[in-house]
């Protein structure tokens, strides 16, 4: 089950930049694998060892659930809950499992970058009108077809931090790191908004605080 677990986490990392549907499939697979594994006593022990922090994170979803009756549009509220369901499942699933080993981290991070490379290539083709888009705002935001422009910018900022992390930890080839840094820099400039730039600098500051 450990191999399946790491595979599904890698699938989730791969699909983060490719839209809600593949992410949902990966999340459902993770949840089913977690249930089929059983051994809930050991999982609860692991959560207690982490001072119930996974449950605290999962509680953020319950806050959304609490506010649902106060929503002006119940259908919109239910859709928001569906989108934020990972806030409930992922902390419990990840928090009840053993930490990832170095090789597992490499597989997960590599999957994230492969997915990001595919999505950025797709987005770039949309931005130069080779591929169509369903959005009609007439701005560069239309190129972000897999998610909102703001979320895509945040994802690019996260990828920038990950590349720096890989370079510092020497988990990846220097040529790979330079390639992705130039690619991400180009994309951030091309799709830049004030929020994207602020998000990048905020991510850099937070990332360096954790790295050093």
Predicted regions, residues:
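Transmembrane signal-anchor hairpin modules in multi-pass inner-membrane enzymes, especially those
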Residues: 1-69, 75-79, 96-106, 110, ...
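Juxtamembrane membrane-water interface segments that cap and precede transmembrane helices
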Residues: 5-10, 133-145
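Short, conserved clusters of charged catalytic residues that mark active-site
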Residues: 9, 89, 181
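Membrane-embedded alpha-helical segments of multi-pass membrane proteins
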Residues: 20-40, 81-93, 151-160, 198-205
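Aromatic-anchored transmembrane helix interface
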Residues: 54-60, 74-96, 107, 111-116, ...
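Alpha-helical transmembrane segments of multi-pass inner-membrane proteins
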Residues: 104-138, 147-212
